[in-house]
Amino acid sequence: MDFLLLGLCLHWLLRRPSGVVLCLLGACFQMLPAAPSGCPGQCRCEGRLLYCEALNLTEAPHNLSGLLGLSLRYNSLSELRAGQFTGLMQLTWLYLDHNHICSVQGDAFQKLRRVKELTLSSNQITELANTTFRPMPNLRSVDLSYNKLQALAPDLFHGLRKLTTLHMRANAIQFVPVRIFQDCRSLKFLDIGYNQLKSLARNSFAGLFKLTELHLEHNDLIKVNFAHFPRLISLHSLCLRRNKVAIVVSSLDWVWNLEKMDLSGNEIEYMEPHVFETVPYLQTLQLDSNRLTYIEPRILNSWKSLTSITLAGNLWDCGRNVCALASWLSNFQGRYDANLQCASPEYAQGEDVLDAVYAFHLCEDGAEPTSGHLLSVAVTNRSDLTPPESSATTLVDGGEGHDGTFEPITVALPGGEHAENAVQIHKVVTGTMALIFSFLIVVLVLYVSWKCFPASLRQLRQCFVTQRRKQKQKQTMHQMAAMSAQEYYVDYKPNHIEGALVIINEYGSCTCHQQPARECEV
């Protein structure tokens, strides 16, 4: 074919000048990449995109050229051999996820220089050589999640200056090598969650100047030091949820632009007072489900930019140390979870923190100050119960006395009696509403029974009528018995004249006197 085209060009050049143009066009056509030779059986072709998915393939199709995209997901590939994709020099994306790949040779992706997206997730890969991604310097996205990687080669991502997204979730990675991401200057999203990381090196994330989102959740980290994230000037979201973190510290004094931090579900008992001063732009903070008992006033003062915070599920000690937190919450204008319960002391267990502060007068005058600060009168129960004229609890710094010692300043704020009256009214209203609600429930049950079971109600009514008749009969019998038991006395008035009664017999007369008598009728 090439010789024929060359002969035609020479012929046209000899006969007319326009042959030069035709020869140039022919040369251009020869330089264009060849179209795919044919669509393999059972695969789906869309132009220069080939989809061979869920076909139980054990090897990649052969004799493929000119493809821009190849999907071999949901098959039974077990290994990637060296030079397996050498004929796909125009390929821009390659999907190999959901196979059984356990071995990837170092030269498996040879000559795939134009590939920008590579997916190897949901396989059984245990290790990757340093040279695995070297033939693909234009990679933008790599997905290695849901494999069995235990370690990362120190130079695994060397040369990937255009990489923007890297997924390594759900592996068995125990350590992140120092400066492993040094060349990943464009990386914006990094996910190493659901692994087995126990610690972080100070320079593990060095070079990630454009990183905006970092996921380290569900690992085994026991300590968080903000010094482990140096120069991450573009980081906006840091997720450390569900680790085993007990303390949070910061050994470097520098400021970064973090806006969202998730530390929930850990075992945090202590946070350095200055730890949040390095994140002055923090807007969302999640500290729920930890072991915090109180929060230092200095930490609370550094939360000036927060708009949302979660603190539930901690072991709050509702003693004097809780006053600073209660005061801050009463003045906080953002969103926070209302389910903050006291874990100690015993008399306040299960009570809401703000309710306990008010009910037990924890922050009134006369108590000793904590941490060089004194909180004045009781913190109001809720913003909806606080009267307009009452003031919230105020945190006041101490001053120096005449002898140079620190003396607390107490400030008495009005509104205690009004708040107490409001609480009493609230209790009365709540009880009344509960009674009304109970009565309505009873009426509703009777109405539903009357509508759904009329025969049963008729029998029940007849039973009540019969019982009432029996009770009336019993009462009548008792009354008649009582009347018959009474004695009625009738005075007897004889017809003859009371006086002497003369009886005459053969011996003579006998005189006797007759006394009046009474007859008793029964």
Swiss-Prot record:
Effect of deleting the gene: Mutant animals survive in the expected Mendelian ratios, are fertile and display no overt phenotype. Brain morphology appears grossly normal, except for rare cases of anomalous ventroculomegaly. Increase in the presynaptic area occupied by SLC17A7/VGLUT1 in some strata of the hippocampal neuropil of the CA1 region.
Domain named LRRNT: residues: 35-63
Stretches assigned to the Cytoplasmic side: 449-522
Domain LRRCT positions: 314-365
Lipid bilayer topology: Single-pass type I membrane protein
Glycosylated residue positions: 56, 63, 130, 381
Pfam family, one: LRR_8
GO cellular component terms, semicolon-separated: endoplasmic reticulum; excitatory synapse; GABA-ergic synapse; growth cone; membrane; postsynaptic specialization membrane
Subcellular location(s) per record: Cell membrane; Postsynaptic cell membrane
Ranges facing Extracellular side: 35-427
Transmembrane segments: 428-448
Tissue expression pattern: Expressed predominantly in the nervous system by postmitotic neurons, but also in some non-neuronal tissues. In adult brain expression is most prominent in the forebraain, particularly in the thalamus and in the cortical areas including hippocampus, piriform and posterior cingulate.
LRR repeat residue intervals: 64-87, 89-111, 112-135, 136-159, 161-183, 184-207, 209-231, 233-255, 256-278, 280-302
Superkingdom to which the source organism belongs: Eukaryota
UniProtKB keywords: Cell membrane, Glycoprotein, Leucine-rich repeat, Membrane, Postsynaptic cell membrane, Repeat, Signal, Synapse, Transmembrane, Transmembrane helix
InterPro entries for the chain: Leu-rich_rpt, Leu-rich_rpt_typical-subtyp, LRFN, LRR_dom_sf
Signal peptide segment: 1-34
GO biological processes: establishment of localization in cell; exploration behavior; locomotory behavior; long-term synaptic potentiation; negative regulation of receptor internalization; positive regulation of synapse assembly; protein localization to synapse; receptor internalization
SMART domains: LRR_TYP (SM00369)
Described purpose of this protein according to its UniProt entry: Exhibits strong synaptogenic activity, restricted to excitatory presynaptic differentiation, acting at both pre- and postsynaptic level.
Family: Belongs to the LRRTM family.
The protein's name: Leucine-rich repeat transmembrane neuronal protein 1
Gene name of this polypeptide: Lrrtm1
